[in-house]
């Protein structure tokens, strides 16, 4: 539900790494949406033409682009940390792409696909999901050896299994 206050629309919240952020929308004379993160507030500046049309889809798109950018940076960092931790085990490629009902998956060609929506969850879930997918590079199925490998590098993984 959106609440209108003067020139701002305040959404209840958006999540970044499990933390709630207030979203404030300000309509300005600009041609493209802009976002700024100020403490626990995500300021979204939208062109005034969207205020007249009442189009809130542009807000959703702006937030998706924000998640995409955060995901690009953070996933790359965690992928590199995981590669080092696993002594060079790495996918052939990885792709950041929205996939329904999943945070990530490993394809037969050893490409890992990661949903950018993962940045809404705690950062440890990102680490767990990436470790999980890296382990699929060595063990295709959830065998005993697969789970032993995960446990070796993340002994407390079970607390993230239900979320991921």
Predicted stretch roles:
Residues 1-127, 137-164:
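Active-site-proximal or metal-binding-adjacent scaffold patches in catalytic folds
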Residues 130:
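Walker B beta-strand of ABC/ABC-like P-loop ATPase nucleotide-binding domains
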Residues 133:
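Walker B catalytic acidic pair
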């Amino acid at each position: 539900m959106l609440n209108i206050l003067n020139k701002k629309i305040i959404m209840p919240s958006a999540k970044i790494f499990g933390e709630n952020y207030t979203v404030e929308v300000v309509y300005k004379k600009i041609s493209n949406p802009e976002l700024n993160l100020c403490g626990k507030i995500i300021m979204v500046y939208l062109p005034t033409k969207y205020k007249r049309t009442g189009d809130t889809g542009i807000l959703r798109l702006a937030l998706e682009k924000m998640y995409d950018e955060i995901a690009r940076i953070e996933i790359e960092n965690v992928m590199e940390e995981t590669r080092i931790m696993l002594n060079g085990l790495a996918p052939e490629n990885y792709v950041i792409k929205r996939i329904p009902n999943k945070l990530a998956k490993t394809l037969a060609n050893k490409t890992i696909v990661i949903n950018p929506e993962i940045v809404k969850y705690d950062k440890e879930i990102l680490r767990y999901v990436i470790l999980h997918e890296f382990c699929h590079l060595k063990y295709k199925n959830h065998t005993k050896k697969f789970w032993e490998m995960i446990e070796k590098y993340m002994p407390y993984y079970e607390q993230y299994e239900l979320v991921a």
